Structure formats: C-alpha cells, structure tokens
C-alpha cells in the first residue's frame, strides 16, 4: 500500500512538471510582446487620458465659461474654480486649479465641459520635484494647452465621429 502511494506521488509530480515545461516551450519561440519602456513606446489612442490642458479659441480668448460643471462632476474633488462676472455680463474664471495628486483621470471633466475647454492630452510623462507644484493653475493649464494645441485638435477631430 505504501509503495502504491509513493508511486502515485512521483507520477503526479512528473506529470505536472512536464505540463509546466510544455507551457514554457510553447511560448519560448513566439514573438515577444514585452515593450522595453522608455526606449520603445506603444502607440496611444486619441482618447488617451493624460495631463490636463485648458484650450483657447482661435482669437486667443479662453474657452472656459466658468459653468463649474467639471468641478461638480469630478468624483475626486480635484478641480477648484472661482469666477467673476465681466463687464459684458459673461462669466470667466479667475482661478482654475487641478490637484494632480487627487485626480483619477476618469475624463468626466472633459465629457461635462459644454465648450470643450478642459481636455486630457496624450502626455503622461510628467513629474513634480517640489511640494505644492502638483496643483496646476489656470495659467499653467492654458500654457500647456497652447503648447499642445495641434495634437489636441487632431485628437478631437479623430474622435469627433464617436461623440
């Protein structure tokens, strides 16, 4: 009886060993799918949600109308907006801050914006070296939007048929 149990344990162990080797051998000669980041980069979708930016109209006026929908819809409460009324009766933002540590990059702010003012770009490689620099101000977001406007416009055009 003991010999029978020892035989079963040895047989069971070898079968499992050969099954594991078969899986290893199966993938040993296939094309590798691992990307060696940062030397190699994968293509990004036009819908990729990375660093935020604020956009302007072609005449240079900022698009944000201070409706505060993005602030209301943000599940992480990462957006802070303060606004005031201008002489012509329209509202504009005086403060538009995004806390990048709180942001979960869900894209709700982008979807809620009626004038396409706040967008998320393809840029995902950024870092903060000092305390407090993780809060992006209105000026920083506008400058970032100005810098990447051509890519943002191309991504919006490519994604337009799905909106």
Curated annotation (Swiss-Prot):
It comes from the Bacteria. It comes from Hydrogenovibrio crunogenus (strain DSM 25203 / XCL-2) (Thiomicrospira crunogena). The gene is nuoI. NCBIfam families: NuoI, PRK05888.1-4, PRK05888.1-5. Keywords: 4Fe-4S, Cell inner membrane, Cell membrane, Iron, Iron-sulfur, Membrane, Metal-binding, NAD, Quinone, Repeat, Translocase, Ubiquinone. This is NADH-quinone oxidoreductase subunit I. Binds 2 [4Fe-4S] clusters per subunit. Its main location: membrane. The keyword S-adenosyl-L-methionine does not apply. SUPFAM superfamilies: 4Fe-4S ferredoxins. GO terms for molecular function: 4 iron, 4 sulfur cluster binding; iron ion binding; NADH:ubiquinone reductase (non-electrogenic) activity; quinone binding. [4Fe-4S] cluster 1 binds at residues 64, 67, 70, 113. GO terms for biological process: aerobic respiration. It is found in: Cell inner membrane. Its cofactor is [4Fe-4S] cluster. Belongs to the complex I 23 kDa subunit family. GO terms for cellular component: plasma membrane.
């Amino acid at each position: 009886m003991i010999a029978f149990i020892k035989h079963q344990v040895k047989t069971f162990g070898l079968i499992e060993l050969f099954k594991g080797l078969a899986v290893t051998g199966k993938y040993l000669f296939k094309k590798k799918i691992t990307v060696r980041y940062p030397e190699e980069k994968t293509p990004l979708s036009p819908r990729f949600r990375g660093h935020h930016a604020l956009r302007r109209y072609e005449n240079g006026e900022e698009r944000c109308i201070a409706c505060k929908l993005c602030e209301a819809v943000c599940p992480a409460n990462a957006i802070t907006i303060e606004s005031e009324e201008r002489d012509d009766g329209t509202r504009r933002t005086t403060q538009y801050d995004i806390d990048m540590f709180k942001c979960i990059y869900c894209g709700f702010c982008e979807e809620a914006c009626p004038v396409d003012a706040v967008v998320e770009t393809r840029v995902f490689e950024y870092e903060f070296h000092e305390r407090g620099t993780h809060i992006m101000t209105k000026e920083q977001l506008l400058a970032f939007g100005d810098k990447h406007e051509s890519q943002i416009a191309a991504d919006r055009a490519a994604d337009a048929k799905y909106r």
